[in-house]
Amino acid sequence: MEEYRAYLELHRSRHQDTLYPLFFREYIYGLACGHGSILVESVGYNNKFSLLIVKRLITRMYQQTHFIIFANDSNKNPFRGYNNHFYSQIILEGFVVVVEIRFSLQLFISSLRELEIIKSYNNLRSIHSIFPFFEDKLIYLNLESDIRIPYPIHLEILVQILRYWIKDVSFFHLLRLFFSYYYNRNNLFTPKKWISTFFSKSNPSFFLFLYNLYVQEYESIFIFLRNKSSQLRLKYFRVFFERIFFYEKIEHLVEVSVKDCSYTFSFFKDTFIHYVRYQGKSILVSKNTPLFINKWKYYFIYLWQCHFDIWSRPGTIHINQLSRHSFHFLGYFLSIRLNFSVVRSQMLQNSFLIKIVMKKLDTIVPIISLIRSLAKAKFCNVFGHPISKPVWANLSDFDIIDRFLRICRNFYHYYNGSAKKKSLYQIRYILRLSCIKTLARKHKSTARTFLKRLGSEKLLEEFFTEEEDIFSLIFPIPKTSFTVQRLYRGRIWYLDILFRNDFVNHL
């Protein structure tokens, strides 16, 4: 229990208002907080979620020999104001929290046994530290393979995977009950609809758990195969549950076990191969010949077909030359750029021209995809022309400007790793004009008239502030310093970014 309290303390800043009860051990309740995510919207249940209602429901479950709430012919509601689907949602959310505890606490339990909590907390790293890893390693590699994790997987296989580390028979009965209930209710688990159900808005935690369970199983086998081909020491980064809370840098030999947890980012490092997984996609990069990486390609295909009964065509895994193709990763387009330079060398009376080729990781901002994301959020149209934000017109002027400024700063903060920042100027232009049009809409005037009336007021001064000035606020160096200008033109990877940009999630 002390370990669990420590977990709550570390995540208190990310807590939600929803309380999840654990009802598998008599009447002892544990409350799990900190399950907030930028990927998953919180479910409010129409503000009717009550711990008292849950307690009454648990008591009723202990007294009954069957689940009345799952009966198809039962439309009666034993409690006022709540329907049967509400009961199923409560039980399902509690069920997911129970099975996720083993995953979410594994890192902290292992840290508490060997280290202090504070020391473990200080080892947290930013998402942006992944890109310096790429800068150091990708320039020496030549092949990249994009792997799309295939769906669907049979539900009974998921149950068999869980049997390795859960021995409670009633647990599997309850799991099959959920499968049967949601299959009959919405027919969710048909192959055509399986992909969308993994991140269903109605039950995101449940489907995220199933997805990570499946990926954890195949990656543990992949680690085993990789260790058979190399005995070198491994370094890898890890993140919980596709939710991008944080990740911790670990340096140790990986122990392959079916009990290993599923992580979003995993780097298996040796001289020849690197592996990265994020969302539903994996990247495999290598310095070896195409025959070698093609061998790994068929390893994955046979693994999915023989172990998980998933049919995956070879065309779903693409092998590309890094020097000729770019790939998408966490909101960036990454590619290897060749810089050519000519050096003149003279030896005695003879002179030579030496052509030098240097490789450099090129990080490009996907401006078209970002404009598409801004269009979905109603900041502009599909052509990139700014429009007003009507839903914010009822806010105060300060709140409207503050929201636009926060979005603009987040863009610059997240994409400062790109050496070509001209694309960000277009994003700033869209947000600035959208802010002006929203303010003009609120005051019932045109954008031109509103700007003229604004006159000498400095309401939008921060939007017109040069990026060098903002950068100088971050680094206390004189504005005229050549160091500031040089740093600004180069890449800046911030080590305080624990979440992806909200607009990156739509790319």
Curated annotation (Swiss-Prot):
It comes from the Eukaryota. It is found in: Plastid, Chloroplast. GO terms for cellular component: chloroplast. One of its GO terms (biological process) is tRNA processing. The keyword tRNA processing applies. It holds the Pfam family Intron_maturas2. Keywords: Chloroplast, mRNA processing, Plastid, RNA-binding, tRNA processing. The keyword Plastid applies. Its main location: plastid. One of its GO terms (molecular function) is RNA binding. Belongs to the intron maturase 2 family. MatK subfamily. Usually encoded in the trnK tRNA gene intron. Probably assists in splicing its own and other chloroplast group II introns. This is Maturase K. It comes from Amphicarpaea bracteata.
